[in-house]
Regions:
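Extracellular, repeat-based ectodomains that mediate carbohydrate processing or recognition
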Residues: 1-181
Length: 181
């Protein structure tokens, strides 16, 4: 397999014990993502009622993590790394999302800003006394997304405080956060 992107395959039939797969669907187009390597691979969750979620923890096209820049189209969506997902109510025969965000729903900046506003503005290194100004956050690649029996999404991601030079682990603030609707 030499192509990039995330593909969805569905089983069409079983023939003499072999699963016959239908035509592949490019479900996460790499052209819709920012700098390669900063978005996770996709995760899929489906309940018994055919309600499902397919998602990644990633950045939108226009974010260049290496250069530290954010331009369109990401600057019109979000420049942050964020959970991005599509939902289905028919076992993945069709998927829905925000059309203005490459058919992904995503956790908006306002949610992260609300969390960030409760964090301390600085962190003092206990060994050196160096004071770092906390000015951003980061999300590692450890995450999970699931749908419950009512079809509601549940997203768990890591949030780490960031300064100009370091990542900071702040007791009682940084760690795993659970988002749901």
């Amino acid at each position: 397999w030499t192509r990039t992107g995330n593909y969805l395959f569905t089983s069409e039939a079983v023939d003499q014990g072999y699963i016959v797969l239908g035509t592949e669907t490019l479900i996460v187009n790499p052209q819709h993502l920012g700098t390669d390597g900063y978005s996770s691979t996709s995760i899929l969750s489906m309940n018994d009622n055919g309600q499902g979620l397919l998602g990644i923890d990633g950045i939108f096209n226009g974010v260049d993590m290496d250069a530290g820049t954010c331009g369109p189209p990401a600057s019109n969506i979000t420049c942050n790394k964020t959970p991005m997902f599509k939902i289905t109510d028919n076992y993945g025969q069709s998927w829905a999302g925000d059309h203005s965000a490459y058919d992904f729903y995503y956790v908006p900046d306002e949610v992260f800003e609300d969390i960030f506003s409760t964090w301390p503005n600085t962190d003092v290194d206990a060994c050196t006394g160096e004071v770092s100004v906390i000015n951003d956050f980061w999300s590692w690649y450890e995450f999970d997304m699931r749908v419950d029996q009512e079809g509601n999404p549940h997203i768990v991601i890591s949030l780490i405080a960031e300064s100009d030079n370091y990542f900071h682990f702040l007791d009682g603030y940084t760690g795993f956060y659970h988002f749901t609707i």
